[in-house]
């Protein structure tokens, strides 16, 4: 059974209220990016990997929350970090792993 997506953080909602046109453009970009052969699960893991590689803490938290809502297991998210470790280095991998722990603890 597919879970519903988690609500965005309050700061995101406040930003969206302040800049509604940017929010609309953001939603359109997200919808356009979904077109293609990847299923939701694969796309979510790819987005997590990109967020990890870019060391974007907020994006890692968001991707993890959404992945967990899709039913992706914490162990699978941890494997994405392990796969990224040889690219981003051990200190960065440990930092990302703590971000994932934050997201997993909130579910």
Question: Which stretches of residues belong to each language-model region?
Answer:
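Short runs of predominantly hydrophobic/aromatic residues within well-ordered alpha helices
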Residues: 42-45, 77
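C-terminal structural segments of small proteins and small subunits
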Residues: 75-103
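Amphipathic, charged-and-aliphatic alpha-helical interface segments
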Residues: 44-57
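Residue-level preference for alpha-helix termini and adjacent loops
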Residues: 14, 37, 51, 59, ...
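Mid-chain, well-packed structural core segment of small domains
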Residues: 55-82
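Acidic, glycine/proline-rich low-complexity segments that act as flexible tails and inter-domain linkers
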Residues: 1-43, 68-69, 95-107
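Residues within well-ordered alpha-helical secondary structure of globular protein domains
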Residues: 28, 49, 83-86
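Short acidic alpha-helix initiation/capping motifs at coil-to-helix transition points
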Residues: 21-27, 54-61
